[in-house]
Amino acid sequence: MFRGATLVNLDSKGRLSVPTRYRDQLIENASGQMVCTIDINHPCLLLYTLPEWEIIEQKLSRLSSMNPQERRVQRLLLGHASECQMDNSGRLLIAPVLRQHAGLTKEVMLVGQFNKFELWDETTWYQQVKEDIDAEQSDSGVLSDRLQDLSL
């Protein structure tokens, strides 16, 4: 389970250093094998362990290639999926096309989201957080059933 938001840097080769608190877990659960793809709803990337990505692939394989919307989702997620292996220094090489999609340059936010990480440009991340908070504060107060049951 991944949680928290951490600022990491991309080096000149497009590698990011995985925070040490996650490295052992990634090696133990996935031998450091990861898959990165685009988020189709936000300007960020999604980073999964290979075993977790294989579950996503199974779900995608059950979508119909004859349904245009389902085919688009398959094309976007699978077509951008790129395997990356964590090296001995705990770094992951993020493909240039993926970095371009999310506007990643130097400062990157690594955001834990249960079974995956999101990778955001730092400035874009803080803009998104502000938009999310503003949306929650201006919301009409109508909550989904799941949110009504959420006690914090």
Curated annotation (Swiss-Prot):
Assembly, per entry: Forms oligomers.
UniProt-recorded name of the protein: Transcriptional regulator MraZ
UniProt family annotation: Belongs to the MraZ family.
Entry keyword Transferase: no
One BP term from GO: negative regulation of DNA-templated transcription initiation
Main location: cytoplasm
TM region positions: none
Compartments (UniProt record): Cytoplasm, Nucleoid
Cellular component aspect of the GO annotation: cytoplasm; nucleoid
Keywords recorded for this protein, A-Z: Cytoplasm, DNA-binding, Repeat, Repressor, Transcription, Transcription regulation
The keyword Ubl conjugation is annotated on this UniProt entry: no
GO molecular function: DNA-binding transcription factor activity; transcription cis-regulatory region binding
Listed PROSITE patterns: SPOVT_ABRB
Gene3D superfamilies from the UniProt entry: Transcriptional regulator MraZ domain
